[in-house]
Swiss-Prot record:
It comes from Nakamurella multipartita (strain ATCC 700099 / DSM 44233 / CIP 104796 / JCM 9543 / NBRC 105858 / Y-104) (Microsphaera multipartita). Keywords: Autocatalytic cleavage, Cytoplasm, Hydrolase, Protease, Proteasome, Threonine protease, Zymogen. The formation of the proteasomal ATPase ARC-20S proteasome complex, likely via the docking of the C-termini of ARC into the intersubunit pockets in the alpha-rings, may trigger opening of the gate for substrate entry. Interconversion between the open-gate and close-gate conformations leads to a dynamic regulation of the 20S proteasome proteolysis activity. The lineage of its organism: Bacteria, Bacillati, Actinomycetota, Actinomycetes, Nakamurellales. Its EC number is 3.4.25.1. PROSITE patterns: PROTEASOME_BETA_2 (PS51476). It holds the Pfam family Proteasome. Pathway: Protein degradation; proteasomal Pup-dependent pathway. GO terms for biological process: modification-dependent protein catabolic process; proteasomal protein catabolic process. This is Proteasome subunit beta.
Length: 288
């Protein structure tokens, strides 16, 4: 590295003061002080009623099972009455024992997920320990609250967060049969712990109705995944913004399963087998 014609390290005086200032373990707080323009939703204010036409993600479901918790999402993004994308991914592994699904403004939501992942990594590096599941859920609530201005302009992000506590001593009372917990949020950053199952997005009403009929707390992991895909199928059946399994294009829901051993995204081939079984079953019994 060359500084003033000399090869060496950067002088301390060349490092911005914000980078040298002691702070908390929150990367979001650091970024807000050092480079605030890099945070999601920092665009200038829009006139009332002038929200741009942008892709929106739709339906996400989560349910607990005997081994943990499953999060699944359809692959469709819409822009008004247009299908903006058929294979968007809306469910992500957040860290080793949690996952996040997103509904709402797709661009801001994906950016928020990236920042949330970095937030969890940064905290672990700075503090030397990982956040508890409640701590992760609270950090996400703070990030959503920071997007309130954009939400008031029609660019809302509504995530669904789920996971399993890594350390049983931190959370000795298991919420789900396998220790799985589910958190929903409102656009103002309100955090709510859900029990057994939940869904967000435009097709959530239909998905929750399907989960109410099909949910089985004693189901194993494959059974829970089947229930999640069935719920997304029902949502797609009644909600035009939710995409069902596309056997022609081989586009299937994104599924992440979280157990005490960790969070694992199921491959398209694995989900495809489940989706094909669901479609075959609906050929015989369309109502499920």
């Amino acid at each position: 590295m060359t500084v003033d014609g000399q090869v060496g390290r950067w002088p301390v005086s060349a490092i911005p003061a914000a980078y040298m200032r002691p702070g908390s373990g929150s990367f979001t707080e650091f970024l807000a002080g050092a480079e605030p323009h890099l945070l999601p939703g920092r665009a200038g204010a829009q006139p009332a009623g002038a929200a741009p036409a942008v892709p929106h993600g739709t339906t996400i479901v989560a349910l607990t099972c005997e081994q943990g918790v499953v999060v699944a999402g359809d692959r469709r993004a819409t822009m008004g009455n247009i299908i903006a994308q058929r294979d968007i991914e809306k469910v992500f592994v957040a860290d080793s024992h949690s996952a996040i699904g997103i509904a709402g403004t797709a661009g801001l939501a994906v950016e928020m997920v990236r920042l949330f992942r970095l937030e969890l990594e940064h905290y672990e590096k700075i503090e030397g320990v990982r956040l508890s599941l409640d701590g992760k859920a609270n950090r996400l609530a703070t990030m959503i609250r920071g997007n309130l201005g954009m939400a008031m302009q029609g660019l809302a992000v509504v995530p669904l967060f789920a996971g399993v506590e890594e350390d049983p001593e931190v959370d000795p009372v298991k919420r789900g049969p396998g220790g799985g917990r589910i958190f929903s949020y409102d656009v103002a950053g309100g955090k709510y712990e859900e029990h057994d199952y939940y869904a967000v997005g435009s097709g959530s009403t239909f998905a929750r109705s399907a989960l109410k009929k099909r949910y089985n707390a004693a189901a194993d992991l494959p059974g829970a995944v089947r229930t999640a895909v069935e719920a997304l199928y029902d949502a797609a059946d009644d909600d035009s913004a939710t995409g069902g399994p596309d056997l022609t294009r081989r586009i299937f829901p994104v599924v992440v399963a979280i157990t005490a051993q960790g969070a694992v995204r199921w491959s398209d081939d694995e989900v495809g087998v489940v989706a094909e079984a669901v479609v075959a079953g609906r050929m015989v019994n369309p109502g499920g």
